[in-house]
């Protein structure tokens, strides 16, 4: 039986006992290609399936660069950010990133790459020795070589290129949850 002398000791114990898994993802609600206006983005739906299955902590990667509400305008901004190699500031940070052994990283494919806020996230933390599993949503491009690309950006991490790739519209179906769970089982995490 554990006995705590102060409430702060209890909180510290509880915080240290958090999940060893972190599901970090970039996803946008609103006007999405091929699915219309949605309250929850396609990649977030996959992230929720993964984190619920693993009982993992979640971190929504959000940059300080607001995107316009219309899909066409969003894509123009995303392309401009990519061509300028722009790094938006993240509006929040992961507390105690070092505690996580395994990171699941999710993102949509925009112009054959993740959104630029994902690069900011990757550059903001030390991934040395961490297991990294990638998942993405797309509307026809597949993962577009991003798994190998991210593996190259994280040479000190153990990045698996056996990622989960799903069309955004399919991420909204009941089958998506089972496919995400089957992927995690196959990874043997």
Question: Model-derived features: where do they sit?
Answer:
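Glycine-rich phosphate/pyrophosphate-binding loop and the adjoining helix
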Residues: 159-189
